[in-house]
């Protein structure tokens, strides 16, 4: 029986990926549909995708599939054939192709079965995730962006919104999607007579959010088809003005795709104009934060002098310091509270309600 998971170290896998000469394409896709046996579906698809040399992260649940992957260009047609034939619901599924891509976004294939493909915290048997808002293409998005009776709602996390968003979009300030959903209902309560446009990176969160808003009695609910990635692709292909400003945060090694030339964020250490995310180099921290080149050199990639000092200690001393706090300091830590307390960044002023 084939091995259905990776057994090679991350270091070796990353070295192999960097040594590849065949160009790769970074792709994301999702689909809400019923999978009766997620584990069997996962195992079957894993074998086929591994043969196509696919790398990346795929979540599978009874409610569907969510994937961010990279595919060798010479295997792309084979990959599409595998995916489109994996289930009738996946035939001709839309693939979001990365806008900025060197093909080095992933170095291992990880496929996991989860309870949900996006953690929403919804525990209401009357909720119908199939009853979603209306899709909007790029030209429709632009028209609604200029409409004073329309509210754009960003259904991404604080660190995503910080580096890029649609003009005048409402931020729902939270670390998690499950917290955002009820917050969005409360914040938009006085805007029930307006058009509500939900958006996210690739469409998976805003599609479910649109269903959640309809479930809570909102009538004119829309969501951006394919999220920011597809909007930017359509807008650029059609020569439309970009209503999204800044950078689109992505969950791979790139950490962002440039959408417009605007840099709307600032270095979390010195305040210089910057929108480049990084993880603190201290193995006991890995805080996600924005760091300019000057501060990267000054702090050697760390988020603070404390982490810099700790990183220079002998390994045994580092491990002793980290002991007992590992569970709270996982790699790719994205907590807004931790960011504010570590770097002494004040919480931004956020509107309580949509105007």
From Swiss-Prot:
Q: Which CDD domains match?
A: RHOD_YceA
What InterPro entries does this protein's entry cite? Rhodanese-like_dom, Rhodanese-like_dom_sf, Rhodanese_C, TrhO, TRHO_N
Q: Which Gene3D superfamilies match?
A: 3.30.70.100, Rhodanese-like domain
Q: Which PROSITE patterns match?
A: RHODANESE_3 (PS50206)
Q: Quick one: a GO biological-process term for this protein?
A: tRNA modification
* UniProt xrefs under SUPFAM superfamilies: Rhodanese/Cell cycle control phosphatase
Please state every residue range assigned to the domain named Rhodanese.
146-240
Highest taxon of the lineage: Bacteria
Q: What class of enzyme is it?
A: oxidoreductase
EC number, UniProt record: 1.14.-.-
A GO MF term: oxidoreductase activity, acting on paired donors, with incorporation or reduction of molecular oxygen
Q: Which cysteines are joined by disulfide bonds?
A: none
Per the record, what are the reactions this protein catalyses?
A: uridine(34) in tRNA + AH2 + O2 = 5-hydroxyuridine(34) in tRNA + A + H2O
- Cite the active-site annotation: 200 (cysteine persulfide intermediate)
Q: Which UniProt keywords apply?
A: Oxidoreductase, tRNA processing
Q: Which NCBIfam families match?
A: PRK00142.1-1
Give the family this protein belongs to, as stated in its UniProt record: Belongs to the TrhO family.
Which function does this protein serve?
Catalyzes oxygen-dependent 5-hydroxyuridine (ho5U) modification at position 34 in tRNAs.
Protein name per UniProt: tRNA uridine(34) hydroxylase
- What is the species of this protein? Pectobacterium carotovorum subsp. carotovorum (strain PC1)
Encoding gene (name):
trhO
């Amino acid at each position: 029986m084939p091995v259905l998971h990776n057994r090679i170290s991350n270091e070796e896998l990353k070295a192999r990926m960097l040594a590849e000469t065949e160009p790769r394409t970074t792709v994301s896709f999702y689909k809400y549909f019923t999978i009766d046996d997620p584990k069997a579906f996962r195992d079957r698809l894993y074998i086929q995708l591994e043969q196509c040399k696919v790398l990346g992260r795929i979540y599978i649940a009874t409610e569907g599939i969510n994937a961010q992957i990279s595919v060798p260009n010479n295997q792309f047609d084979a990959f599409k054939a595998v995916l489109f034939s994996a289930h009738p619901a996946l035939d001709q599924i839309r693939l979001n192709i990365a806008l900025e891509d060197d093909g080095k976004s992933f170095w291992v294939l990880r496929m996991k079965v989860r309870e949900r493909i996006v953690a929403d915290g919804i525990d209401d048997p009357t909720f119908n995730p199939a009853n979603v808002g209306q899709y909007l293409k790029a030209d429709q998005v632009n028209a609604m962006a200029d409409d004073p009776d329309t509210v754009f709602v960003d259904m991404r996390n604080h660190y995503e919104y910080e580096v890029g968003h649609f003009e005048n979009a409402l931020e729902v300030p939270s670390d998690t999607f499950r917290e955002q959903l009820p917050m969005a209902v409360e914040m938009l309560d006085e805007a029930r007579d307006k058009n509500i446009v939900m958006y996210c990176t690739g469409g998976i969160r805003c599609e479910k959010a649109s269903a959640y808003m309809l479930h809570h009695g909102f009538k004119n609910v829309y969501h951006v088809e394919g999220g920011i990635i597809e909007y930017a692709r359509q807008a650029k292909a059609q020569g439309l003005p970009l209503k999204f400003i800044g950078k689109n945060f992505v969950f791979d090694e790139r950490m962002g795709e440039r959408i417009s030339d605007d840099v709307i964020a600032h270095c979390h250490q010195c305040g210089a104009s910057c929108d480049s995310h990084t993880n603190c180099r201290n193995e006991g921290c890995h805080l996600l934060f924005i760091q300019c080149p000057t501060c990267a050199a000054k702090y050697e990639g760390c988020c603070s002098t404390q982490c810099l000092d700790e990183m220079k200690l002998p390994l045994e001393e580092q491990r002793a310091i980290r002991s007992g706090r590992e569970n709270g300091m996982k790699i790719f830590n994205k907590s807004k509270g931790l960011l504010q307390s570590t770097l002494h960044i004040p919480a931004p002023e956020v509107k309580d309600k949509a105007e």
